[in-house]
């Protein structure tokens, strides 16, 4: 238990163009060295590419995130000199953060020329339940399933 008062969560302002809080969080994750305009250009460019193929790019992005969100993950826990990988459920906030992180990681490793193109293609693949980010989630779930026997070590 914390000794001091709990720090309140900061509210994220909705995105000016699409009115989405999720998109604002995504912009913040893409941003490096405080260059928000560059991060916005990347994400808006990706959403425009998605928009040329689909009706609602925000819906595609949210579907992609939903398909990448992990339900369970493993945490290391030492018990009597042995380290066990204990499966634990993921909090909703962490689910979203992990999904965004994995999508971004997968997009950065892709081969397309611009980051906007990489992001768009990774989101489109994730929305169709394929791609590197979805594979990462499947691997995480597989690890948790394999270590189900240690779930009684949960804390």
UniProtKB/Swiss-Prot annotation:
It comes from the Bacteria. GO terms for cellular component: small ribosomal subunit. InterPro entries: Ribosomal_uS7, Ribosomal_uS7_bac/org-type, Ribosomal_uS7_CS, Ribosomal_uS7_dom, Ribosomal_uS7_dom_sf. Pfam families: Ribosomal_S7. One of its GO terms (molecular function) is rRNA binding. One of its GO terms (biological process) is translation. Keywords: Ribonucleoprotein, Ribosomal protein, RNA-binding, rRNA-binding, tRNA-binding. The keyword Oxidoreductase does not apply. The keyword Ribosomal protein applies. One of the primary rRNA binding proteins, it binds directly to 16S rRNA where it nucleates assembly of the head domain of the 30S subunit. Is located at the subunit interface close to the decoding center, probably blocks exit of the E-site tRNA. HAMAP family: Ribosomal_uS7_B. Belongs to the universal ribosomal protein uS7 family. Part of the 30S ribosomal subunit. Contacts proteins S9 and S11. This is Small ribosomal subunit protein uS7.
